[in-house]
Amino acid sequence: MRKKVLSLILLWAALLALALIYTDRDEYTWRYEGDELAQIVIPREEADARQKQADEAMALTQQAAQARTDAGLWGSENEWEDDFLPTQGENGGLNLMWGDYQATIEYEDAARMDAHVVSAGYQAFIENGDAHDEAEAENVLLHRLSFVFRLTDSTPNLYLASENSEAIRAVTVHKVGAGVLSADLCAYAALVGAVLTALLVLSWDQTERGRKNRRDMAVVLCAAAFACMPLLWRGVYDGHDLFFHLNRIEGIANGLRNGQFPVRIHSSTLLGYGYAAPEFYPELFLYIPALLRNLGVSLCACVRVFEACIHLATAVSCYLCVRGMMNSRRVAVGASVLYTLCIYRLVNVYTRATLGESLAMVFFPVVMLGLYEVLRRDEKKWPLLALGMTGVCMSHLLSTMFCVLFCAIAALASAGKLLARKRRILAVLAAAGVTALCALWFFVPMMQYTADGISTSVVLNSSEYVHRPGSFLVGFAGDVKADAPEDFAYTIGVVPGLALLIGCALLLARRYAAGRAEMKTENDRLALGLLALGALALLLSTDFFPWRTLCSIRKPFSTFFMQIQFPWRFVGMAVPMLSAAAAWGYLREEKDAKTGMAALIALCVVFSGYTMQTMVQRAPELEKETYTDTRIGQFEYTYPCTEKTALKVGDVRTSQPGVCSVLSYEKRGTELTATVQLEGEAAYIELPLLYYPGYRAEIDGQAQTVARGTNNMVRVYGLSSGESGTVHVWYQPPTAWLIAQAASALGALLLAASLRRMRRRA
């Protein structure tokens, strides 16, 4: 035992040593000298002029936004040109993410040196950005002024302004703590270490069972590693929803740093105004990259590690679940390879960048196994169904709806067994009850905010996003940037993949050749049943289903179908079922198992490899030091008529313009404190926070009324004219939410206890 523990210690020590050795000592360090100084240092007068120009431009933008709202054109211009920016701007300045930075200025003899960290339009995000130095020593070639400033949120176009800019000879900006031990390398090492630890532990079992486990895991992990190929390039490639999910990760990280748990408002999103995405989009699993982010890992590395974890979890989940269903190791390995390297799943992860749907696909096999146990085999294993449905529910809402639909179809197909054994019905109800209890902490806020009138979803014409049956034969990805409805569906490879479809064809061929008499085993019936359900899911993604008719009927009946947005999402439901069926088609006969496995792996590698290769034939959008904007363009999850282009950083306003002076201002997450002086009469004060139910306010310790204001900003009543006062605003979740959280915690404990009892019984 000592040798085993020592081997683990040596493994992790070696990984830590590698991270230390390969840490770039100059990471997050930018130095300017000579002609480069013009890119970071500007005179104080120029900084003031830029700020004035930014204020004037924002005033015009706000006027235009109000005009659009008055004309009923709300939300028509919520797009920005640059979601991602390089750290060093092409025209000068630094684009930096949040954090503490040290600025060091080297200057020649001057009686006094001053430095001010400035960013036109973003000044409210800079703390401790002013520094002064009195030159004491004489006959010194260069004096040095060093100070630490903080960026509370991501800040672009950052410069150093000075009254004596001509005396500056060099400037160095360095992120505090960087260059000692790279957090990114530590995150990568932790992921590799976890995989190697699992393999090392498996190697300790020298029995025949242990040998088989090692063989299976080697193939499964190789499939997951191959799916990670695009992550091995130098950055993260832009996907359709990548920017939205990056802001979710940053929002959770910001909330955790400022004391929110669970995070109910993404306080960093929309220039710090806040965004209630957590009430409408499940994000339990995004706490993993958010925690990494708060440990100093770059956003790029967080996404890479998280997507690699998704691939690993998907491969292992499918292997374990298919093995549990069919009691066959080789079929489980084959299904795992097919599922992990399925073109649709890879497109979900990389091209569409739908982290929610990709996470849901981790749990689809668990739902499949749990449902099979409850309906056909051992209803006492209902906790598996509850676990799978809870995982899907905490990943993606539409996927949850699809799972419920197919569970209902499977239940109808097994109605005879359900009615013959009433305990199966009780097991289904138990799984549904535990799932609902675990998800209560999410659904209660969602229902409350939806009832309050907050926009919840983008409604699209689903009939425009359907497949033609021939598109399922597309084996290679084409234009990875395709965006038009049909172009994306047909050229991007949103299809199961030929490797999977060939396996299904082999299953049907075996069935036809053998005849009914030779296909009577339980696995035969299961594979054919999964094939039928998978084919139904594929049918729902095509124009054979009357999407056009259903989307054209009178509202609100059509709204349900239009909110599905993309019917080809049903391919995601088909893939786990078809993977198991196809694996049985390839590997049913033991005498042909080696040939079948070789063909299966070869087809998967060729088709998925080419697909992933096309994905990386462009420059990555997100790299280690890339600046990521927080102004998302989605229209949902805010009150109607919220013009996101009109949101101004640190905007404090009153009912009468020009009568308010801000004496001090501090914002920490969803908590904001400002001391203001009123020079005239004002009925209210508005603060740079988007209003959501739950905000509370005090002025000098006295509770005040909070309401929706201009552009749905937080409006506080209670300031008296001619007086100064300290306004304190914070977000407080309703009591009903806290009760729901407690109920969900109880549900999670109940689920864990049920799984443990099930395992002990097994």
What are these regions (language model features)?
Residues L647-A762:
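Active-site-proximal, structured, solvent-exposed surfaces of multi-pass membrane proteins
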Residues G34-Q53, T69-G72, N78, F84-P86, ...:
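Extracellular carbohydrate recognition and processing domains
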Residues E108-S119, N164-A167, P693-G694:
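Extended, low-complexity, turn-rich repeat/linker tracts enriched in Gly/Pro/Ser/Thr and Asp/Glu
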Residues R2-E27, A178-P620, V729-A762:
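Membrane-embedded transmembrane-helix bundle of lipid-linked glycan/lipid transferases
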Residues D35-A64, D70, W74-G75, Q617-E671:
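Membrane-interface segments at or immediately adjacent to transmembrane helices
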